[in-house]
Amino acid sequence: MKDVLDEIVAWKRIEVERSKALLPPSELYRMVERQIAEEQSAPPSMREALLASPIGIIAEFKRRSPSKGWINEQARAETVPLAYERNGAAAVSILTDEKYFGGRDEFVTEARRAGLTIPVLYKNFVVDEYQLFQARRCGASAALLIAADLTLSECRILLRLAHELQLEVLLEMHDERELDYVELEPDMCGVNNRNLGTFITDVRHSFDLAQRLPDTMCKVSESGISSPDTVAQLREEVSADSLLVRTS
């Protein structure tokens, strides 16, 4: 079976280089530095919002996926995330990958301009520091780093840069081989119940891996959460602080 993650990451490296040709890194970096200097405060903390919430729902804005095709091609970033906020979501995850998930960086900007105040997770396949500047530029509070995409050293460098840019990091893991990445002390650790190589989902991943994470870690269970019973079990058995739920 074709490994979808490898395909996506290979394309992402090409895509980033094309973006750099359109907007050189030095120019983007200056824009972000100026933006940070002019801001009244840092973006709202996603970690704090999740820990303060009784349920900790991260509602996801996603138009399509490689496994399901188009979910809602007409979903609008100006309205859907605001509806999530009104209905009690602690944070919003916005897919910004265009080729495979139908997303754009502008979706984050549009949601912010429409009045979204809760934290936004920039959900993409980050393999280059340039993408973290893109995330900060469009108004995200946190960025997703996927352990399977990065060496430990690469992840350490990107995490440090994210913090310099006032971005928190949700570090996503899928199997026990990636538990070493916890030593980097990310702001949040996510256990993805979906295998990103095959897109097969098994919620047992959260039960198995989350129990091996430090008690002090903010734990997020991602994908395959479709029933109240699963929600209750995750929060009770593995002390999951947050649940990432696809709702669009």
Across the structure, where does each feature detected by a protein language model lie?
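Alpha-helix-loop-beta-strand connector modules within alpha/beta enzyme cores
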Residues: 40-55, 102-125, 147, 156-171, ...
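Structural preference for beta-strand elements that scaffold enzyme active sites
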Residues: 56-60, 91-93, 119-121, 141-144, ...
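Catalytic cores of alpha/beta
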Residues: 127-139, 175-185, 221-245
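Active-site beta-loop-alpha junctions enriched in small/polar residues
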Residues: 11, 62-64, 97, 125, ...
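Glycine/Thr-rich beta-alpha phosphate-binding loop at enzyme active sites
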Residues: 63, 67-75, 80-102, 181-210, ...
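Active-site mouth loops of central-metabolism enzymes
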Residues: 58-78, 119-127, 170-172, 220-226
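An N-cap/entry alpha-helix motif that binds or orients negatively charged groups
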Residues: 2-72
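Glycine-rich phosphate-binding active-site loops on the catalytic face of alpha/beta enzymes
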Residues: 94, 134-154, 191-200, 238-248
